C-alpha cells in the first residue's frame, strides 16, 4: 500500500509539456540549466521529456538523469505512450537517475477511442494493464494517465484506473487535456475516483490540466480539496495552446492560504508546516530563467511573477502600502525571491565581490562562466555606474545562457535620424571563423541591422515578434530584447541584454538564427544517417 504524502507533490513538466509551446524549443544545455534550477527550486519530480520522440529528447532526458537525478535530488521522469518501444526508450533514458519514473498514457474518452485510437473499451483496458505491467518491469515508480479523463465516461474511467493500479501503477494522473472542465466538475471527478476505484488507496492521485478557459489553477486547487496529492504544472504556465497550470500560482496560493487548505490535508488550520517542498525564494529566478531561455515573455500583470504583481499605481493604494504593506499586499515580494533592488556593485568592485554576490543570488557558475560574466559586468559598469541585482541577473543570463555560438556579432554600426535613411553595417564571425561584413538600409535602425545580418547568414526566416524591456529604471538601464522568428512551420527565439538596445537587438537576432542554423545542421545529419 502506498503511504499518502504529508505534502502536496509538485511534478514539473516545463521541459516536456511546457516545451511544446510554439517557439519554446530548447537545446540540451538549456534543458539541463532549467533542470538544475528546478532542483534548486525543490520540485519533487521533473518530467524531463518524451524519450522516444527524438534522439535529442532521449539525450536530454538521459543527461538530466545523469546530472540532476541524484539520491537527494528530484525524481526524473520520461513520458511514454502505452507502447513497448516508447516505454523501453523511457526506461533506458531514466536509467542513470537514482530515482526514475515512467509516465505512460492512453486515451479513455469515447471521442479519442473512436477517432484517434480506433479501439474498443475492452481493448483500451487490456492495453493499459499490459503496458503498466511492462513499465513496472523497469522501475517501481510508474505513473498512468487516462488521456482526456475530463471527457471520459466515469464508470469506464474507474475500470481503467482500477486495472492500471492492479498492474502496478503507483500514481494515477487525471488530465483535463483540453482545459474543458470547471472547478466543481473537476473536483467531482477526483471525488468520484476516490469513492469508486476500490484500490485507489494504493496510488497517489495526480492532476494535469490546461488553461484553455483560464481555469487550470482553480481546477487544481479544487482537486486538492477532493484528494489529489500531486500537481503537474509548468513554470510561468507555459505549454500548448493557452498553457498549463502555473507552478508559481499553485504554490503561492497554497502558501498564502495555508490555513484554508490545511484541513483538507488532515492538519490543524493554524499549522505552519509548508504544504510543498518548494523553496519559494527561488520562484522569481526560475521564472526569469525559463522566460529568457524559451523566449516566452511573462505578461506584466501575471500573478506572482509579472512585473506589475507588486506594483501600485493608485494613490490610495500607494499610501496604504507605505504605511503597512499588508493593507494592499497579501504576500511579501521577498517570499518569491524579489530583492529590494539595492545597489550592490559598481565599476570598482572586484571579482571576489562579484562572485560573492552571484552566490547570494543563487547563481552557481563554473570558473569559465564566471570569467565571461565578469568581463561583461565590467563592460556594463563602465557605462552604468550603479549595478543592481536585476542588472547582475541580466548580465549572467545574457552571457552564460545563450544559444550555440555559431555566428557571433563582432561589430554593429548604425546611422539614422529624422532626415536620414537608416543604414546599418554589421560584422559577423561565421562558424568557420571567418569575419564577414555587410550593410543594408531599412525602415529603422533595427530593421537595417536585421537586413544586414540576413545578407551575411542567408537563412530565410520571418520575424514574428520583437520586444524590448528595461531591466531597471533610469536612462542608463540595461535593455532586454526578445525576438521570435519563423522558419517553415517552426519558431525559434533569441534573447540578449545590453545598455545599447541596437546591439542587444542584433545579438538577440543572431541568437535566434544560431538556434535555427543548429536545427538545420541536425536535420542534415539525421538525413545522412537515414539515407
Curated annotation (Swiss-Prot):
It comes from Nostoc sp. (strain PCC 7120 / SAG 25.82 / UTEX 2576). Its EC number is 2.3.3.13. NCBIfam families: leuA_bact (TIGR00973), PRK00915.1-3 (NF002086). Residues 8-284 form the Pyruvate carboxyltransferase domain. Pathway: Amino-acid biosynthesis; L-leucine biosynthesis; L-leucine from 3-methyl-2-oxobutanoate: step 1/4. The gene is leuA. Its cofactor is Mn(2+). The keyword Mitochondrion does not apply. Catalyzes the condensation of the acetyl group of acetyl-CoA with 3-methyl-2-oxobutanoate (2-ketoisovalerate) to form 3-carboxy-3-hydroxy-4-methylpentanoate (2-isopropylmalate). One of its GO terms (biological process) is L-leucine biosynthetic process. It is found in: Cytoplasm. Homodimer. Residues 408-531 are annotated as: Regulatory domain. Keywords: Amino-acid biosynthesis, Branched-chain amino acid biosynthesis, Cytoplasm, Leucine biosynthesis, Manganese, Metal-binding, Transferase. It is an enzyme of class 2 (transferase). This is 2-isopropylmalate synthase. CDD domains: DRE_TIM_IPMS.
